[in-house]
Amino acid sequence: MIDRYILAIESSCDETSVAILKNEDQLLSNIIASQVESHKRFGGVVPEVASRHHVEVITLCIQDALQEAGITAGDLSAVAVTYGPGLVGALLVGMAAAKAFAWANHLPLIPVNHMAGHLMAAQSIADLQYPLLALLVSGGHTELVYVAAPGDYRIVGETRDDAVGEAYDKVGRVMGLTYPAGKEIDQLAHQGQDIYDFPRAMIKEDNLEFSFSGLKSAFINLHHNARQKGEQLRLEDLCASFQAAVLDILMVKTKKALAAYPVKTLVIAGGVAANQGLRERLKEDIKDINVVIPPLRLCGDNAGMIAYAAAVEYEKGHFAELDLNAKPSLAFEGLE
């Protein structure tokens, strides 16, 4: 058997990343150039700043990925790239680099959905069994996805408004926490008590949709009213109460999805999958099913996950022409 090497590029938001995957499961390198420090003072990602940073470092990331993997461009079988969803300017930088590299080295180009990458990062620790259900939770998405077979993704539930990671960052900004706030809120939540009665939107409705805007608004109103009255609120208790509400919503909807779509494997992926509170609740609430969560290093945006998803597309023969364009609002098939 001839070894297959895929070079994958991810630039959908504020991480520039390049990875090399050997065959289906050997991640030889996964270079990540983070821009978090550049965006902290703005309290969120500035698209123009993100694009400029990608331009500055992407060539070096490609060189480092090849060097760390111990291979050359001549060893590669294909080039994969995230083409959506994400920030259009950021996506275009990665795509331009991928297309130029593929053209110069006479390699096929594999287009990869960013969220498929998050989902397939689970392949790094387990040979996934299909059909499976996935809960994808990140700064831009909250989705329940039914995967009948490798590469066959179908959204069966999603948020009507804010993504869960977006809600974390917004309440973190209200409390004066550093962006991104998810990790700090999780840590503070473990030191506090769930004493504030925040809403759990839509958990009694017979559907698989999420809503976090009401929870976010309730949190902001409580914090604002307390400041107006000169009252002191413990951040630990605020975070514990907020996170308890988030986890209740996620668990209720995930259990409903598992009842509607009987599977043997549940994948939890996306940046919010790094949340320790979520991992603890999964152990408590989800029984008699194999729960697979990618390692922390593959939860955030990275090209390693794109490479795992690309391996599936390679086997299916899904390649793109060099006129491939970015799709910032790219989705899976959509709701039933």
Curated annotation (Swiss-Prot):
CDD domains the UniProt entry points to: ASKHA_NBD_TsaD_bac
Residues annotated to bind Fe cation: H114, H118, D301
Encoding gene (name): tsaD
GO CC terms of this entry: cytoplasm
Lineage: Bacteria, Bacillati, Bacillota, Bacilli, Lactobacillales
Primary location class: cytoplasm
BP terms from Gene Ontology: tRNA threonylcarbamoyladenosine modification
PANTHER family referenced in this protein's UniProt entry, alphabetically: TRNA N6-ADENOSINE THREONYLCARBAMOYLTRANSFERASE (PTHR11735), TRNA N6-ADENOSINE THREONYLCARBAMOYLTRANSFERASE, MITOCHONDRIAL (PTHR11735:SF6)
Cofactor binding annotation: Binds 1 Fe(2+) ion per subunit.
The organism of origin for this protein: Streptococcus mutans serotype c (strain ATCC 700610 / UA159)
Any one GO molecular function term: N(6)-L-threonylcarbamoyladenine synthase activity
Family per similarity comment: Belongs to the KAE1 / TsaD family.
Protein name, entry field: tRNA N6-adenosine threonylcarbamoyltransferase
Disulfide feature: none
Cofactor: Fe(2+)
InterPro entries assigned to the protein according to its UniProt record, in alphabetical order: ATPase_NBD, Gcp-like_dom, KAE1/TsaD, TsaD
Annotated function: Required for the formation of a threonylcarbamoyl group on adenosine at position 37 (t(6)A37) in tRNAs that read codons beginning with adenine. Is involved in the transfer of the threonylcarbamoyl moiety of threonylcarbamoyl-AMP (TC-AMP) to the N6 group of A37, together with TsaE and TsaB. TsaD likely plays a direct catalytic role in this reaction.
Residue positions binding substrate: L136, V137, S138, G139, G140, D169, G182, D186, N275
Catalyzed reactions: L-threonylcarbamoyladenylate + adenosine(37) in tRNA = N(6)-L-threonylcarbamoyladenosine(37) in tRNA + AMP + H(+)
Keywords, sorted A to Z: Acyltransferase, Cytoplasm, Iron, Metal-binding, Transferase, tRNA processing
Subcellular localization: Cytoplasm
Pfam families: TsaD
Enzyme Commission code(s) on record: 2.3.1.234
